[in-house]
């Protein structure tokens, strides 16, 4: 038992991961970031990186989103958690508490009475926090733009990072918006200089 008496080097087996049925390669094998990481790890046995790059990589791989479904767009927001789209494979998962969330997805018509509650939930989220505006009602009021009780875009209440157009937008459009947010997080620095 243990490592005594072994003459071979201890090497972890090649990770198999989830294979893409179309190409037969592991999912994410064409990602330049991971190819550089794997090349450096197999060459040296360790990785040299900046803390900024490591923090950014961790943030993009573990986005927890706050569900703020206000109207029919919320149904499409639920679809990305189902098996067909499986948003968790991209490192995103819904959370019920704003204190555990990184992203707020505003899906639907924001009314004047709901605006203070939206802002309160946004203020309870820890930094860095991001907002995705989903659907034409959240983006600019939609069909109810001229109603006295509708806020003409949630960007009047909270700062919005990604706009997903459509009425309602498809689950693919929301998934694309989340991937754009991950790309935006990778581009921005984490440490203020």
Swiss-Prot record:
Its cofactor is [4Fe-4S] cluster. The keyword Cell cycle does not apply. GO terms for biological process: aerobic respiration; electron transport coupled proton transport. [4Fe-4S] cluster binds at residues 72-73, 137, 167. Residues 1-23 are annotated as: Disordered. Keywords: 4Fe-4S, Cell inner membrane, Cell membrane, Iron, Iron-sulfur, Membrane, Metal-binding, NAD, Quinone, Translocase, Transport, Ubiquinone. It catalyses: a quinone + NADH + 5 H(+)(in) = a quinol + NAD(+) + 4 H(+)(out). GO terms for molecular function: 4 iron, 4 sulfur cluster binding; iron ion binding; NADH dehydrogenase (ubiquinone) activity; NADH:ubiquinone reductase (non-electrogenic) activity; quinone binding. GO terms for cellular component: plasma membrane; respiratory chain complex I. It is found in: Cell inner membrane. It is a peripheral membrane protein. Residues 1-11 have a biased composition (Polar residues). The keyword Nucleotide-binding does not apply. Binds 1 [4Fe-4S] cluster. Its EC number is 7.1.1.-. Signal peptide: none annotated. InterPro entries: NADH_UbQ_OxRdtase-like_20kDa (IPR006137), NADH_UQ_OxRdtase_20Kd_su (IPR006138). HAMAP family: NDH1_NuoB. NDH-1 is composed of 14 different subunits. Subunits NuoB, C, D, E, F, and G constitute the peripheral sector of the complex. NDH-1 shuttles electrons from NADH, via FMN and iron-sulfur (Fe-S) centers, to quinones in the respiratory chain. Couples the redox reaction to proton translocation (for every two electrons transferred, four hydrogen ions are translocated across the cytoplasmic membrane), and thus conserves the redox energy in a proton gradient. Belongs to the complex I 20 kDa subunit family. This is NADH-quinone oxidoreductase subunit B. It comes from Brucella canis (strain ATCC 23365 / NCTC 10854 / RM-666). The gene is nuoB.
């Amino acid at each position: 038992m243990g490592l005594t008496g072994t003459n071979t080097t201890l090497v972890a087996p090649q990770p198999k991961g989830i294979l893409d049925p179309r190409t037969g390669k592991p999912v994410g094998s064409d990602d330049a970031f991971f190819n550089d990481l794997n090349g450096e790890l197999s060459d040296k046995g360790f990785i040299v990186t900046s803390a900024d790059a490591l923090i950014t990589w961790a943030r993009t791989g573990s986005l927890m989103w706050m569900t703020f479904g206000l109207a029919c767009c919320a149904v499409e927001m639920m679809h990305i958690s189902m098996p067909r789209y499986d948003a968790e494979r991209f490192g995103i998962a819904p959370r019920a508490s704003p204190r555990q969330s990184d992203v707020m997805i505003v899906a639907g018509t924001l009314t004047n009475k709901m605006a203070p509650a939206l802002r309160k939930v946004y203020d309870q989220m820890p930094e860095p926090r991001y907002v995705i505006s989903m659907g034409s009602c959240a983006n600019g009021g939609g069909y109810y733009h001229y109603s006295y009780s509708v806020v003409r875009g949630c960007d009047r209440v909270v700062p919005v990072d990604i706009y997903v157009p459509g009425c309602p937008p498809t689950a693919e459009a929301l998934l694309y918006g989340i991937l754009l947010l991950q790309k935006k997080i990778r581009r921005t620095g984490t440490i203020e200089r």
